[in-house]
């Protein structure tokens, strides 16, 4: 009898746990999907903060302030672990095979530009009443300023880079390099 109760209880738990479809279809709260994001003003503010956060990544927060060490305004004497590639660049030892400084600027700038474009596109489509027209204009102005900031670094470091004007997908991700004038005007 006791054995039958255990089997019945196990079967009930087994079938009860697998019958709930909603149980397995939850969106993770730490990384919401596009279908549940962009529903309210705080989502747009979070996305804008995420775009600003690119400016606090290693290359922008640690290496960029040390670029005076590449001029006659300062001297770079610290190890690579302290200030990234500034000493290597100052000594003229940076090669294309080294990662870090060169690739981080490129990647982080385009990460920021991608976030800007996604935010601008979603803001353009948003019809909620919790964001006023003035707030939309202000957010768009911040997006354009951030995009200009990222392109200014790309221009300073690379001159001719792809100019991205919208979110990219698999069909549009291979963009040609733009001329220096196009990058500068962006």
Question: Model regions: which residues?
Answer:
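Bacterial Sec-dependent N-terminal signal peptides
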Residues: 1-29
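Short secondary-structure capping/junction motifs at helix and strand boundaries
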Residues: 2, 62, 129-131
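Membrane-proximal, proline-rich intrinsically disordered regions
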Residues: 20-71, 174, 181
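Short, well-structured active-site flanking segments
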Residues: 27, 155-166
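Short, solvent-exposed turn/loop segments enriched in Gly/Ser/Thr/Pro and often Arg
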Residues: 62-77, 82, 154-155, 162
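Short, charged/polar, low-complexity loop and linker segments
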Residues: 168-170
């Amino acid at each position: 009898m006791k054995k039958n109760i255990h089997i019945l209880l196990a079967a009930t738990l087994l079938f009860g746990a697998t019958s709930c479809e909603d149980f397995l279809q939850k969106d993770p709260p730490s990384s919401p999907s596009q279908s549940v994001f962009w529903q309210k003003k705080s989502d747009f503010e979070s996305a804008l903060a995420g775009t600003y956060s690119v400016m606090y990544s290693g290359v922008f927060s640690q290496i960029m302030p040390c670029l005076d060490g590449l001029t006659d305004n300062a001297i770079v004497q610290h190890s690579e672990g302290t200030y990234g590639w500034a000493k290597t660049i100052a000594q003229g030892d940076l090669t294309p095979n080294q990662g870090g400084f060169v690739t981080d600027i490129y990647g982080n700038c385009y990460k920021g530009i991608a976030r800007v474009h996604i935010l601008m596109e979603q803001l353009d489509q948003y019809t909620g009443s919790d964001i006023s027209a003035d707030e939309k204009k202000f957010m768009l102005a911040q997006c354009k300023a951030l995009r200009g900031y990222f392109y200014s670094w790309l221009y300073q470091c690379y001159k001719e880079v792809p100019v991205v004007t919208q979110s990219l997908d698999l069909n549009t991700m291979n963009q040609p390099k733009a001329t220096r004038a196009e990058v500068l005007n962006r």
